[in-house]
């Protein structure tokens, strides 16, 4: 996702406020719209953006609006690469955090399904985190649209 590689890409940064989650979803959907994704593909992508951004806000920054969430999206042929990053508190036990129904904030009545949803809705999923060093979630999805073959 770098300039000059022939790929199309975008980068977006915003305050770690819950109201920005919808903005992030719409921005990513608008950017990938030229690939003419199906409604299911678009819904999947919007859902994973919501999950990743919400994780950054709630878990990474503990709902501190001074934090910054970064989204990077790259398009190469028919493949979308999506990266959501924060410089928050990081995840102590990433493997535990990836377990379905696990949540570090049970008082918020969250389902603990964010990573599971991201992993199941995307073709590739990788999370990297270090306690005190933030979290980066990188995902890829191939768009089935015929239009994607010509862009």
UniProtKB/Swiss-Prot annotation:
In alphabetical order, the GO MF annotations are: ATP binding; protein serine kinase activity; protein serine/threonine kinase activity; sigma factor antagonist activity
Q: Does the keyword Hydrolase apply?
A: no
Q: List the disulfide bonds.
A: none
Top enzyme class: transferase
Where does the source fall among the domains of life? Answer: Bacteria
Cross-referenced InterPro entries: Anti-sigma-factor_SerPK, Anti-sigma_F, HATPase_C_sf
- Which Enzyme Commission numbers does its entry carry? 2.7.11.1
Keywords in alphabetical order: ATP-binding, Kinase, Nucleotide-binding, Serine/threonine-protein kinase, Sporulation, Transferase
A GO biological process of this protein is: asexual sporulation
Which Pfam family, an example, fits this chain? HATPase_c_2
Q: Which reaction does it catalyse?
A: L-seryl-[protein] + ATP = O-phospho-L-seryl-[protein] + ADP + H(+); L-threonyl-[protein] + ATP = O-phospho-L-threonyl-[protein] + ADP + H(+)
**Mind telling me which PANTHER family this protein's record contains?**
ANTI-SIGMA-F FACTOR RSBW (PTHR35526:SF3), ANTI-SIGMA-F FACTOR RSBW-RELATED (PTHR35526)
**Biological role stated in the UniProt entry:** Binds to sigma F and blocks its ability to form an RNA polymerase holoenzyme (E-sigma F). Phosphorylates SpoIIAA on a serine residue. This phosphorylation may enable SpoIIAA to act as an anti-anti-sigma factor that counteracts SpoIIAB and thus releases sigma F from inhibition.
Q: Which family does it belong to?
A: Belongs to the anti-sigma-factor family.
Please identify the protein, giving its name as recorded.
Answer: Anti-sigma F factor
């Amino acid at each position: 996702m770098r300039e000059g590689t022939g790929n199309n890409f975008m980068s977006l940064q915003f305050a770690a406020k819950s109201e920005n989650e919808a903005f992030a979803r719409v921005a990513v959907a608008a950017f990938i719209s030229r690939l003419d994704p199906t409604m299911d593909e678009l819904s999947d992508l919007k859902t994973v953006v919501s999950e990743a951004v919400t994780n950054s806000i709630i878990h990474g920054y503990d709902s501190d609006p001074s934090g910054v969430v970064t989204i990077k999206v790259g398009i190469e042929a028919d493949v979308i690469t999506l990266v959501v990053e924060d410089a928050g508190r990081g995840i102590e036990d990433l493997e535990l955090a990836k377990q379905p129904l696990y949540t570090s904030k049970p008082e918020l009545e969250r389902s603990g399904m964010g990573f599971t949803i991201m992993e199941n809705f995307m073709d590739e999923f990788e999370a990297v985190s270090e306690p005190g060093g933030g979290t980066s979630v990188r995902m890829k999805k191939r768009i089935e649209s015929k239009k994607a073959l010509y862009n």
